[in-house]
Amino acid sequence: MMKILLSNDDGVHAPGILALYQALKEVADVRVIAPDRNCSGASNSLTLHNPLRVRRLDNGFYSVNGTPTDCVHLGTNSPMAEDVDLVVSGINDSPNMGDDVLYSGTVAAAMEGRFMGLPAIAVSMGGRGHDYYDTAGRVVAEIVANMENDPLRLDTVLNINVPYTTYDKLKGTRVTKLGRRHRAETMVHDRDPFGSEIFWYGPIGHHASDEPNTDFTAIHEGYISITPLSLDMTAQRHTDTLTDWLEQQK
């Protein structure tokens, strides 16, 4: 049976990770190591200036006072590490599409698994709310079972977004590319009860492209979106242009 390390960024008590654990334990041996609080937006951050403390909960999950990346690193490259065949992160309670992946702790946990040489999956709900986690859990469990029977040998992270609906209403699956969002709305300015100036992030931007092969379009049309993400962030198609430009500056 495949051995899975399961983490997330919404925290070890979040309903998404509980639902995903229930689905995955039917097809794999699952170990949960997750943050002790919500770490949404943590991206690939590490805890470098404080010790990491791990607590085993009554349900067998491990709670960590660190980031999603810390949790996966603990589970794969520390004295508490065990054999792992696959890293899975989620279920995030909202989409991780387009530019979201740069900020997402959900995607970052999967990226850390890939960085440690393991296949990895990040899974998020295509809508905001706490319903239909069972839909996403079933989708991922089916993919994991297929991966065990027929290994997918790609040097990538699979970023999966699942429509916010019941399983029977899913229209299918599309392999997609990342879309783009408009810039976020202006930060909100306020003052705390003591009169000190404070700021809050404004709402995220809406999607900026209606291309047919993006993650946004797939979710909008009722399809599961699977986007392969690479650790190599080199903009390869621009290297010749940059080389020519540098030559002209001599």
Curated annotation (Swiss-Prot):
Gene3D superfamilies: Survival protein SurE-like phosphatase/nucleotidase. One of its GO terms (molecular function) is 5'-nucleotidase activity. A divalent metal cation binds at D9, D10, S40, N92. It comes from the Bacteria. It is found in: Cytoplasm. GO terms for cellular component: cytoplasm. It catalyses: a ribonucleoside 5'-phosphate + H2O = a ribonucleoside + phosphate. Its main location: cytoplasm. Binds 1 divalent metal cation per subunit. Keywords: Cytoplasm, Hydrolase, Metal-binding, Nucleotide-binding. Pfam families: SurE. Its EC number is 3.1.3.5. It is an enzyme of class 3 (hydrolase). Its cofactor is a divalent metal cation. Signal peptide: none annotated. Nucleotidase that shows phosphatase activity on nucleoside 5'-monophosphates. Belongs to the SurE nucleotidase family. This is 5'-nucleotidase SurE.
